């Protein structure tokens, strides 16, 4: 009987029917019951997600647990924060909601607000004691600032920094907020982070820099910004790979051209002796290969096993690349 009443309660919540909610509660529905058909959400979570302040108030007054968690570890405050329901979030905190609670992935309400760009919610949470430097320690080790940088939420990023967020904090893989912004091409945030002291030379666990992330993703404007601020165009990761190699491998022609114009070494080799041209050859990036050859890349350079760019093209079945290297090689030799 109680289970049936709980179902009636959940349906009344979905319908936002106050009278039906009260009737279900008066008949014995469990106000803190979990809806097993929807990740174990409680009545308060439904109301908080919907932003229905009146129902939230009603549920709390009747004993709803403000810190209950669903099967994913989400609280009512997390639902309100994610969906930008400021009045509900304010009430929940007033009634004792934990602003630093984390879900099963270690994500907090502030992180959710940062992802979604919910500035007023983020401001409220910080004012009420949310830790701006908390990390989602169960997964990536990312901070709210990293989430904001990745999502392109400049106002949130600015707020977090003003409130003491560490601009050079690293996640479990050693990635910084600047690397996240660079990878996603969020120019304004990258500029903000640098202005606030972000280390453009920082490397992650694999030795990748913000510039390498920008190059790999083809984010020309961010790459240009980083270089203008002093980023080393020839910096190498732990495998000896440069930004130009990453750009060449993924066919990011404009970034490759930018890097070369800013001094990237077309002859640089990684730990295996492979060059940017070899990377372009393996992945069949014709335009990038043509650019590299035009800029002086040695088509006869060999890696540690004696492989040349054309041998890589043959090995990976890139017949058009074989043709291009032969044709371009002859042309530039004649010049």
List where the protein language model places each region.
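Conserved ankyrin/ankyrin-like repeat signature
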Residues: 20, 54-55, 87-88, 120-121, ...
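Ankyrin-repeat inter-repeat connecting loop/turn
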Residues: 31-33, 66, 99, 132-134, ...
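Start-of-repeat signature of ankyrin repeats
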Residues: 5, 39-40, 73, 106, ...
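Ankyrin repeat boundary/linker residues
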Residues: 35-37, 70, 103, 136-138, ...
């Amino acid at each position: 009987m109680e289970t049936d009443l709980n179902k009636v309660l959940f349906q009344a919540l979905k319908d936002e029917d106050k009278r039906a909610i009260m009737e279900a509660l008066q008949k014995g529905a469990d106000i803190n019951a979990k809806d097993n058909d929807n990740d174990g959400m409680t009545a308060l979570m439904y109301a908080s997600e919907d932003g229905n302040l009146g129902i939230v108030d009603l549920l709390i007054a009747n004993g709803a647990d403000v810190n209950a968690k669903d099967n994913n570890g989400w609280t009512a405050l997390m639902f309100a924060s994610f969906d930008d329901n400021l009045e509900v979030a304010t009430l929940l905190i007033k009634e004792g909601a934990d602003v630093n609670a984390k879900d099963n992935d270690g994500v907090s309400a502030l992180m959710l607000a940062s992802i979604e760009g919910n500035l007023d919610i983020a401001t409220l949470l910080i004012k009420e004691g949310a830790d701006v430097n908390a990390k989602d320690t169960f997964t990536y080790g990312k901070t709210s600032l990293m989430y904001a940088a990745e999502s392109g939420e400049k106002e949130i990023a600015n707020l977090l920094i003003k409130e003491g967020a560490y601009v050079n904090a690293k996640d479990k893989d050693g990635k910084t907020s600047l690397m996240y912004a660079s990878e996603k091409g969020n120019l304004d945030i990258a500029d903000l982070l640098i202005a606030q002291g972000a280390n453009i030379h920082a490397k992650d666990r694999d030795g990748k820099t913000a510039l390498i992330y920008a190059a790999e993703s083809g984010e020309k404007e961010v790459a240009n910004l980083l270089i203008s601020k002093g980023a080393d165009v020839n910096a190498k990761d732990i495998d000896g790979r440069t930004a130009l190699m990453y750009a060449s491998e993924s066919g990011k022609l404009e970034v490759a051209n930018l890097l070369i114009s800013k001094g990237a070494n077309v002859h640089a080799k990684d730990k295996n002796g492979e060059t940017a041209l070899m990377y372009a050859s393996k992945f069949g990036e014709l335009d990038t290969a043509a650019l590299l050859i035009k800029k002086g890349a040695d088509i006869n350079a060999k890696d540690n096993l004696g492989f040349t760019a054309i041998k890589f093209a043959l090995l990976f079945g890139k017949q058009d690349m074989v043709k291009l290297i032969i044709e371009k090689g002859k042309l530039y030799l004649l010049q």
